Amino acid sequence: MKYLKVITASPGLSGAGLVFDYLLDRNDFISPFKEYPDKDQQSEFRFVTDPGGLNSLYNGFYKNFSTNNCAYVYDEFNKYLKKISKLTIVENNKKKKLYSNIFFKEIKKFKKKIIKSSYYGLPQFHRLGLNKKDKLLWKITNRFRSAQQSKFLQMVLPVDEKTFINESIKFVDKVLYSQVINKRKNIVIDQGANFWEPELSTIFYSNKKIILITRDPRSIFASMKSRKSLSYPGHNVNIFIDWYQSIISKIRAFKKSKNVLLIKYEKFIINHGNESKKLLKFLKIKKIDKNIFNIDDSRKNIYKADKVLTKKEKHLIETKLKKYLQWPKKKSI
C-alpha cells in the first residue's frame, strides 16, 4: 500500500508515546488502536515483537529450525493469541478489545496459509511438562491410543520462508487497515518494532518508517520508580544502572539506514522546531498548519525526575551514566 506505516519504538519508558501522539495529531495520520493523542499508553501494538508473537514464530520456524522447535513456537504462538484476546483498552470511557474480532477471524485464515504439514504428537520436551491431569490421561490412554490420536501437541512444518513473509505482510496490512475508518491516511503504530533490531523486526510491515526514541536515564528511572513498573528495575538504582548499561550496549549501528531515525526525547521537546523538521523530512511529508500538537506540557515535565529521585539516586546515575545524560541546561527551557 502506498500510505506510510510509521512505527515508534523505545527501550522502555523513553517517550515513544510523545512522537506517536505528535503524528497522530496530524490530519494525514490515523492509528488502528487509538483515536486521539491523549498520552494514554494503552494502544501499543506488540503482536509482532512480543515473545510468542509473529517474530518469535518466524525465528523459530526459519532461524532455529527443528521439528520440535516448530511445534514449540507454534504452540506458544497459539497461547499468545489466547492471551491477547482478553486485552482491553478504554476508549471514550468504554472498554473495548485492543484486537478486534476481525483480527482473530483473519488469524485463522493466516495460520492455514503458513502451515504446510500438521499432525499431533508428544515429543519428550512436551511430555516432561505435562500437568498431573494430562500425565494421568496419557498413562491411561497410552495402552490403547497413539500419541497422534491423543492430540497433546500439534506438530507443524511451515511453508517456505518467502511465502511466510509474504503472507505475514498481507495479514498485517489487512488487520491494520480493517481497524481504521479512513484507509487513505498514513498509519502510526506505537511499539510495533524491536528497538534493538528495528529493521529485522519490521519485515512484516509494508512501506514502513521506524522511529527510535531514547531518553535521559534520570527520567527513565524516575518514571519506573513512580509508576512502580512491573517489567523494569525501578526499585533499585544500582540494578537500574547495570540494566541501562546492558541494554544501551546492545544498540546496533542503524543510524545510516534510510528507514530508521533516532530521536532524543528531550531534544525533540526543547528544539521542537528543528527536530520536527528532521522528522518530517525523514518521513517525506509536509508541515501542516492545522497541527495543534502542544509541546508545552512535555517541556514543563522534562525535569520532573528532580522531584522523584533522591540525591543519592541522582548522583549515582549522573556519575555512572554520564555519557547518556540528555537534559539540557535549565536556562535553555
Residue ranges and their predicted role:
Residues F45-V48, S226-R227, K304:
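Short low-complexity, flexible loop/linker segments enriched in glycine and/or proline
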Residues N27-I30, N186, Y205-K208:
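A generic structural motif
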Residues M1-T163, S298-K300:
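PAPS-dependent sulfotransferase catalytic core
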Residues P51-Y62, Y232-D242, K307-L316:
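A polyampholytic, Gly/Pro-enriched intrinsically disordered region
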Residues Q148-K174, K323, W327-K330:
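Compositionally biased, flexible interaction segments
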Residues I187-Q191:
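A short acidic/basic microdomain associated with nuclease active sites
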Residues K2-T8, K162-N182, G192-K287:
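PAPS-dependent sulfotransferase catalytic domain
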